[in-house]
Structures are given as C-alpha cells and as structure tokens.
C-alpha cells in the first residue's frame, strides 16, 4: 500500500513511520510512504498557508492554493483522498478494513479551523472523524487512521492476531494475563492455566460479552443482530442475566 501524508509538520508522521510495527512494514516493502510538506507549495517569503475565513469568524483556515498544489503533486493512480476532520463520518473498524483494500491513500492533516471547502469539493473522497472530540493536530488523527488501516493490510500483523482483536466480531477483546501468576493477591483465572482449549475459548467469549456489555452496550446490540452471533454466545449472555432491547433492523 502507498500512503501519502500531507502536513504542515512533517516531523510528526516521520517519527511514526520509523517506529515499531510500521517501521517493519516499511522495511519489508508492505507499506510505502511519502510525506508532503504543504509549506513547500506556499510561494510567499514566509511560507504562509493560512488566512482568515470569508464572512468572518474565529481562527484561520488552510488556504486552497498550497494545499491544492500539494495534492496535485501526489503521483499515485487510483488514490483515495481522506481528510480527517471532526465534521466527518465516524471512523470504525469496518471502514479501516475497507480502506486497507485500496492501492493508495492520501491523508490530509488539517490545522487551524480546517481547510477551504473548495479543496474538499474538488479533491476529497472521504471526510472522517476519529471520535467526538477536537484535537489541535490533524497529524495525530491521521496517524490513528493510518495505524488502524495498516494493521489490516496483509502481512503487517499476523492473521491470528487480527482475528482475536476487538471489534472483529463486534465485541471488545477479552481480558488477558501473563506472568506472574499472582500479582498483588490477584490470581490468574484458573481456566487459563488448565490447558483445556475448549474451556478457555468459552471463558474468553463469555468475558468478551461481559466486557462489551459493560463498556460498549451499543456494540453488543449490533453483535446480536449479526450473522456471526452464535447460539453459544446467546446462551452465555443469558447466563449473565442480562437482556438487551432488540437491535433495530432499519
């Protein structure tokens, strides 16, 4: 996959691509990246990329000329341009898996109060929000998206690791434990030490349901309505003495 990142602060994404799992994916040739400094396309002496909005209002907007030229400089066939913004559609795991099928992604890192609407109208395929909050740095939001998408690209993460992560079956991940067996008088659940794989699998599914019910009841409702929800899962849910309202079909 080719990833182009358009930013006013290239040092932020550069560190990310040189660290940990992403560095290995780059080294293995699975992920190719290019960081485009939008300031390189501003031709005034001070490399200004912002201006006040027409009609008044607080803050500044990223100007269309340097950003448009930066986008034009990206030579990638069949590229998908994504702008990360609080006003976009909510970013979820299913969308991450969908983007992982693209050959080329172009990420626009916003700053100030946003970008000129004409850039969105002419260049942007998707406006995406990573959560119901506002950040000062569009780079941080873009890196969240890049990380989630890259993990779904074949070869970046082991397949079995992906299959057991949160949200794969609309449930959050089960609790996990490692050494030592006892920590501050808290023991590892005995079933995990039993070596009985079927019992361990059932325990983990029950804990997934329990944890999702507690922290993300919206996901549990969706899970029950999905084709992946099994009779075993329904039985475990009933054992937890919890009843959910029917998931809406419309």
UniProtKB/Swiss-Prot annotation:
Specifically methylates guanosine-37 in various tRNAs. GO terms for molecular function: tRNA (guanine(37)-N1)-methyltransferase activity. It is found in: Cytoplasm. It catalyses: guanosine(37) in tRNA + S-adenosyl-L-methionine = N(1)-methylguanosine(37) in tRNA + S-adenosyl-L-homocysteine + H(+). Its EC number is 2.1.1.228. Belongs to the RNA methyltransferase TrmD family. This is tRNA (guanine-N(1)-)-methyltransferase. CDD domains: TrmD-like. GO terms for cellular component: cytosol. NCBIfam families: PRK00026.1 (NF000648), trmD (TIGR00088). InterPro entries: Alpha/beta_knot_MTases (IPR029028), tRNA_m1G_MeTrfase_C_sf (IPR023148), tRNA_m1G_MeTrfase_TrmD (IPR002649), tRNA_m1G_MTases_N (IPR029026), tRNA_MeTrfase_TRMD/TRM10 (IPR016009). It comes from Treponema pallidum (strain Nichols). It comes from the Bacteria. GO terms for biological process: tRNA N1-guanine methylation. Gene3D superfamilies: 3.40.1280.10, tRNA(m1g37)methyltransferase, domain 2.
